[in-house]
């Protein structure tokens, strides 16, 4: 019932003061925590927005990503944070892994470790049950567990790659430039010396046969074959010695027990 002559249907706040009124409800803040509600992973079926265009939440910043014309893709790129978000299941035998730097990686199901390719990260992710950061679950902080292996600086391109061998003095193929180099200088030095020694021995044997058996070779033509074999083996060994002497050497950055 109206009181003091005020109509009960009149507004509680007069028009003269309505411009100074601010809403009392707290503003809506989009949840950005990794524990926020996320859409089902690897599916292109997302709730459409008001205009009927399919959208999905970014798995990094939770912004809406427009899927119009992108439903045939496996991943889409967020226009806000520029990170990738999967909308389909990975190919057969593959799996998605999210690096702590938010880079979306794809690797084999059987992979135990994977290295982040970003120059400002270069993190080695152990895909064991402790450090598994899969897109099937909300991202959890990676535990600082040292992986087995070492990071090697390529002798050709200078890039760093993960080398999983537990012993030095072996050959390694750089995944960046696809060239082969020796990890450590002991192996090429040792093999170069060995091939030089064997090559010189074969050449000395060939010279000895040439000088010591000329008369015998005139009677038995097969003797020339032994000369040729000795010289040929010596030449091959010297060529291999040149190869090992000129091979590039890659040096490890850090070694993990």
Curated annotation (Swiss-Prot):
<keyword id="KW-0472">Membrane</keyword>
<comment type="function">
    <text>Catalyzes the hydrolysis of phosphatidylinositol-4,5-bisphosphate (PtdIns-4,5-P2) to phosphatidylinositol-4-phosphate (PtdIns-4-P). Does not hydrolyze phosphatidylinositol 3,4,5-trisphosphate, phosphatidylinositol 3,4-bisphosphate, inositol 3,5-bisphosphate, inositol 3,4-bisphosphate, phosphatidylinositol 5-monophosphate, phosphatidylinositol 4-monophosphate and phosphatidylinositol 3-monophosphate. Negatively regulates the phagocytosis of large particles by reducing phagosomal phosphatidylinositol 4,5-bisphosphate accumulation during cup formation.</text>
</comment>
<keyword id="KW-0812">Transmembrane</keyword>
<dbReference type="GO" id="GO:0031902">
    <property type="term" value="C:late endosome membrane"/>
</dbReference>
<keyword id="KW-0458">Lysosome</keyword>
<feature type="compositionally biased region" description="Basic and acidic residues">
    <location>
        <begin position="1"/>
        <end position="10"/>
    </location>
</feature>
<feature type="modified residue" description="Phosphoserine">
    <location>
        <position position="33"/>
    </location>
</feature>
<feature type="compositionally biased region" description="Polar residues">
    <location>
        <begin position="13"/>
        <end position="23"/>
    </location>
</feature>
<feature type="transmembrane region" description="Helical">
    <location>
        <begin position="192"/>
        <end position="212"/>
    </location>
</feature>
<dbReference type="GO" id="GO:0005765">
    <property type="term" value="C:lysosomal membrane"/>
</dbReference>
<keyword id="KW-1133">Transmembrane helix</keyword>
<dbReference type="GO" id="GO:0005886">
    <property type="term" value="C:plasma membrane"/>
</dbReference>
<keyword id="KW-1003">Cell membrane</keyword>
<keyword id="KW-0597">Phosphoprotein</keyword>
<feature type="short sequence motif" description="CX5R motif">
    <location>
        <begin position="107"/>
        <end position="113"/>
    </location>
</feature>
<keyword id="KW-0968">Cytoplasmic vesicle</keyword>
<keyword id="KW-0967">Endosome</keyword>
<dbReference type="GO" id="GO:0030670">
    <property type="term" value="C:phagocytic vesicle membrane"/>
</dbReference>
<dbReference type="Pfam" id="PF09788">
    <property type="entry name" value="Tmemb_55A"/>
</dbReference>
<feature type="active site">
    <location>
        <position position="107"/>
    </location>
</feature>
<dbReference type="GO" id="GO:0050765">
    <property type="term" value="P:negative regulation of phagocytosis"/>
</dbReference>
<feature type="region of interest" description="Disordered">
    <location>
        <begin position="1"/>
        <end position="43"/>
    </location>
</feature>
<dbReference type="InterPro" id="IPR019178">
    <property type="entry name" value="PtdIns-P2-Ptase"/>
</dbReference>
<feature type="modified residue" description="Phosphothreonine">
    <location>
        <position position="22"/>
    </location>
</feature>
<dbReference type="GO" id="GO:0046856">
    <property type="term" value="P:phosphatidylinositol dephosphorylation"/>
</dbReference>
<protein>
    <recommendedName>
        <fullName>Type 2 phosphatidylinositol 4,5-bisphosphate 4-phosphatase</fullName>
        <ecNumber>3.1.3.78</ecNumber>
    </recommendedName>
</protein>
<keyword id="KW-0443">Lipid metabolism</keyword>
<dbReference type="GO" id="GO:0034597">
    <property type="term" value="F:phosphatidylinositol-4,5-bisphosphate 4-phosphatase activity"/>
</dbReference>
<keyword id="KW-0378">Hydrolase</keyword>
<feature type="transmembrane region" description="Helical">
    <location>
        <begin position="227"/>
        <end position="247"/>
    </location>
</feature>
């Amino acid at each position: 019932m109206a009181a003091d002559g005020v109509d009960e249907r009149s507004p509680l706040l007069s028009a003269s003061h309505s411009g100074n009124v601010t809403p009392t409800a707290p503003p809506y803040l989009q949840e950005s925590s990794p524990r926020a509600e996320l859409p089902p992973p690897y599916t292109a079926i997302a709730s459409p927005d008001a205009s009927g265009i399919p959208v999905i939440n970014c798995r990094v910043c939770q912004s809406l990503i427009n899927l119009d014309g992108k439903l045939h893709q496996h991943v889409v790129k967020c226009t806000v944070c520029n990170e990738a978000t999967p909308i389909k299941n990975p190919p057969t035998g593959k799996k998605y892994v999210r690096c702590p730097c938010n880079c979306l990686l794809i690797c084999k199901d059987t992979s135990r470790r994977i290295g982040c390719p970003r120059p400002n990260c270069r993190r080695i992710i152990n895909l064991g049950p402790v450090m598994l950061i899969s897109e099937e679950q909300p991202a959890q902080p990676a535990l600082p567990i040292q992986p087995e292996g070492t990071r090697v600086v390529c002798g050709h391109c200078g890039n760093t790659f993960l080398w999983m061998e537990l012993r030095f003095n072996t050959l390694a193929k750089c995944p960046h430039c696809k060239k082969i180099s020796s990890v450590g200088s002991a192996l090429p030095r040792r093999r170069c010396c060995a091939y030089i020694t064997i090559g010189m021995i074969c050449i000395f044997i060939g010279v000895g046969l040439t000088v010591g058996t000329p008369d015998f070779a005139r009677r038995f033509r097969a003797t020339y074959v032994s000369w040729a074999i000795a010289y040929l083996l010596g030449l091959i060994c010297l060529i291999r010695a040149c190869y090992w002497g000129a091979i590039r050497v890659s040096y490890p950055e850090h070694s993990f027990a």
